[in-house]
Amino acid sequence: MKLEVLPLDQKTFSAYGDVIETQERDFFHINNGLVERYHDLAKVEVLEQDRTLISINRAQPAAMPIVVHELERHPLGTQAFVPMNGEAFVVIVALGDDKPELSTLRAFISNGRQGVNYHRNVWHHPLFAWQTVTDFLTVDRGGSDNCDVESIPTHELCFA
């Protein structure tokens, strides 16, 4: 099956998480007016007594064509990825309680200046780079037992 890749924007992505970007976002000045602060762009959630981690993930480009056959989710915390090199990247998401609901399966491509924050329990494809090795600033929950993985029927990404 083919899965069309759509441009990433907050309106179409909102059911799955937050788009982390400055475009069309409010800000206020700090540091004597030298800095524009784009405040509270994503809601970071960590359940239980675990802590929030900030890491850098270096992702390798996916083999082409990009084929999706499994999704994962994190029930105990959100997970954010922000590309550090200005590279566009692809995110693949779905809703669903026990298993991904294929009717909600979507693929998006960022513009290189956007990151994403997946809501808790949102099914998504494991992180990969699109065209070149990419470093991602990653914010997520520390601790174990926070990853469910499900196989899905194979979908091939279709770039419009």
From Swiss-Prot:
Q: Name one GO biological process term.
A: purine nucleobase catabolic process
GO terms, molecular function = ureidoglycolate hydrolase activity; ureidoglycolate lyase activity
- Quote the CDD domains the UniProt record gives: cupin_UAH (cd20298)
Which reaction(s) does the protein catalyse, per the Swiss-Prot or TrEMBL entry? (S)-ureidoglycolate = urea + glyoxylate
State the top-level EC class. Answer: lyase
Q: Which SUPFAM superfamilies match?
A: RmlC-like cupins
Q: What is its EC number?
A: 4.3.2.3
Task: Name the pathway it acts in.
Answer: Nitrogen metabolism; (S)-allantoin degradation
Q: Which cofactor does it need?
A: Ni(2+)
Q: Which UniProt keywords apply?
A: Lyase, Purine metabolism
For this protein, the record's InterPro entries field holds:
RmlC_Cupin_sf (IPR011051), UAH_cupin (IPR047233), Ureidogly_lyase (IPR007247), Ureidogly_lyase_bac (IPR023525), Ureidoglycolate_lyase_dom_sf (IPR024060)
What PANTHER family does this protein map onto? Answer: UREIDOGLYCOLATE HYDROLASE, UREIDOGLYCOLATE LYASE
* Protein family: Belongs to the ureidoglycolate lyase family.
Q: How does it assemble?
A: Homodimer.
Functional summary from the UniProt entry: Catalyzes the catabolism of the allantoin degradation intermediate (S)-ureidoglycolate, generating urea and glyoxylate. Involved in the utilization of allantoin as nitrogen source.
- The protein depicted here goes by the name Ureidoglycolate lyase
Q: What species was this sequence derived from?
A: Salmonella enteritidis PT4 (strain P125109)
Q: Taxonomic lineage per UniProt?
A: Bacteria, Pseudomonadati, Pseudomonadota, Gammaproteobacteria, Enterobacterales
Q: Which gene encodes it?
A: allA
